[in-house]
Amino acid sequence: MRQSSLSSSQWTSKWTNQRMSEWSAIACSWFSSLPEKVSWSGSPKKVALGTLWMLPLMLGGMATPGLAAERVAVRLGPFKQSVAISDLERFADTGEIPPGLQLYAPLLNADVRYTLRSRLHLDPSIGDKLVEDLLHSSAGERFLNTLQVAIPDASPTQLQVALMQAAKQPGGISLLGLLRAFPKQTVTIDATSAIALASQLNLPYWQSQALSSVLERELTVKSQPIRSSIDPTKAGSYWVWKQTMVLRDYQRERTIPVDLYWTRRTHGPLVVISHGFGADRRFLGYLAYHLASHGLTVVALEHPGSNVAWLTGNSFGQSRTTLKNNLLPATEFLDRPQDVSFVLDRLNRLNQFSSTLHGKFNTEEVTVIGHSLGGYTALALAGAKLSLEHLQQFCNDPNPVVFSPADLLQCSAADLTNAQADAQESLRDPRVVQTIVLNPAIGRLFDPKSLAQVTVPTLMLAGTDDTITPAVSQQFLPFTQLKGSKFLLTAIGGTHLSVGDPANLNHVFTQSLFIRERPEQETEALRQLLRGVSLAFVQQLTPEANRYAPFLTAAYAQSFSSTELKLRLNSQLPPNFSQRLKMAALPMEQLISSTLAKGKAESQQGVCYNKLNCLLGGLPLVMFILPGGVPLAANQFFRWRRKQQ
């Protein structure tokens, strides 16, 4: 696992430092073959260090089947170098470096080959709809404008066609396939803008890796063995019944499937599970069974406007044909909390009148567990008010920097009108007395004022390698803004789907290029810990509170750590850590925004005498910190930066 401290003088990780001298020597040796004096205005020169390394990431999603492109030309300031796509294909297929790529041999390692060979496994019918929704969304034009800055000689129409056709490729989308299919003989990439674009796509990695070593160091405690007669990770003694029901909300025209888990003897609060965008009610099935086996009644509901069936056009009670402007309807951010309140109302009736389920639902004491967008649902029910002004300010920026899929998703809510927002002044449901939010997508939906309204106990999970809902903006900063009783469970190395039920996950995506998830065997310890901690957290509302309290301690969580995942549990972050979080997020946002704003500005003329410093001087840090990659020459970069300052 790559780790890096937060200090500006120690950006690279211990792992990086161990290999830096080797890579620096290679890089410097390679550059020593260049002429001592490199002109900034003459004929094309050798491409800058790292440009080819960036190439696969720059080109993802930027090509179409049609006229086959033969070469790619990368422009970095006054430098311009082209390579044959066939040479890249040969390297990807065989591992051999053809003569046309010999110049870049030091950079063509196994990670680059893996990136070139990787495919995004996607059902063409689903991919086509997803891209179509994106292109017709309020963010679509901004997205295309950003791509056009990176590919300056491509028209908006070419980019749109490219994206649409790429999503239809059978067998998945490969980067070289996208490049080869672009309808131009030579594809020109503006490296500075493309690096900035790649930076936004990979900023979650930068944030995660920059914080990982700091978190591991500062959240670690001297652990003592937990002595107890019970093990909250083991299944309880009760036999669990499961029943599926379909509830119809005629007023809102929504059909809501629910899975009920209950036992012969029921006690404690009712547990409601809300899934994330594109998932379903079975995403946390293992956790539902576990909690129910200890005598808790669990209800897992499905949101018809944002579930996996909705993506394929087969959802109950929600037609995708009504969607015109966003990845999902803006009203879904109002409907989701209302789905839960509606289900509670119906369960209350069953609790009174059903012969089978009488007394099974404690609807006056409810714990809501939400994953991803379900985390938003839970906190909205707990009193956090959607901050429309805060959201629109971010989403309507003329140079928006959209760092993660979670940001794009949350911007769908920006199309809510003030009247709609005012009509739902508060989605708070007083029956919700606890929340467990796992990898929540909340960083843009709530501001500090709205999060301060959450007074119920909250357990939040953050994964430092989560590229869907990046930990810095979506969990760590929001956690510091909660004012009630709270716990932060940090999975250092954890990803977005690490807590998902392996029986209900598509394992293809754990090895995908764009969704970097861990195999289930590496994340089992986290799911085991979640079983124990969730049970202990819910039991705090029962007479068993003191008995389960030891399982809500830092030492207990830490005992589940593995080589792949370091697990920590804290009730608060270390002093001044909020400032460190802001330092991790804001400088890169400003850097990328300013880089994109420059657009196609002409490069400055001049002469560069120091080859390595000249080539590295204008590149953003995140160029060197990529998933699966090595931070090339980062030490030299920062030493030179300090000298210049």
Predicted regions and their residues:
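N-terminal cap/lid segment of alpha/beta-hydrolase-fold proteins
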Residues: 219-266
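Alpha/beta-hydrolase active-site loop
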Residues: 323-359, 398
